[in-house]
Amino acid sequence: NAISISLNSETFGEILDRLKEVLTFIDGKINVASGDSMTTLKYRFESEIPPVTQLKLKIETNCREHFAELGWERKYFTVSSEWYKGECFITTYKLEELLGTKLRALYQRRKGRDLYDFLRAFQQHSLDTTAILQCYRKYMEFSVGQVPSKKEFLLNMEEKMKNENFIGDITALIRPEEKYNQEEAFELIKKELIEKM
């Protein structure tokens, strides 16, 4: 998944056209859907790593949340792959804000890959957990009006950890040789974030 945000409430058509243009290197079927708060591009294609499976790339653009709790950041970005080489500066969130929205997603949906993202973020960066929780609360209040209690969040996660779809959804997304333990990721998030709610 890729997630982007519209920085203001202007129309999104020009950006959508540009996204489709730069993603022409993906061989596969594209589907575009627009709603009140989200525009979604979905691509279907085959994996390059055996066993070959059908994969989906979903690019969601949030067209409702036009704010950054911790302020915007300009980052240098470069890509060098078999398909594309390029560089630019992008306007993005601070990492803690991205993880605050990821924590909201972890609560609201059944995607075990969110735990994987947290584990990698904690392994690779020194993070301000207070800022992550501040952003989580802000985005929960904005989207649903109420922030779940620590107990509610923990019960939600304990139920998800029993769900095979939640546990197994990361399998096709990581290389077979990569070592990943979902329980370890959950324990880390519990200690670093849930217990501090």
Regions found by a protein language model. Give the residues of each.
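Structured mid-to-C-terminal alpha-helical surface segments
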Residues: 2-197
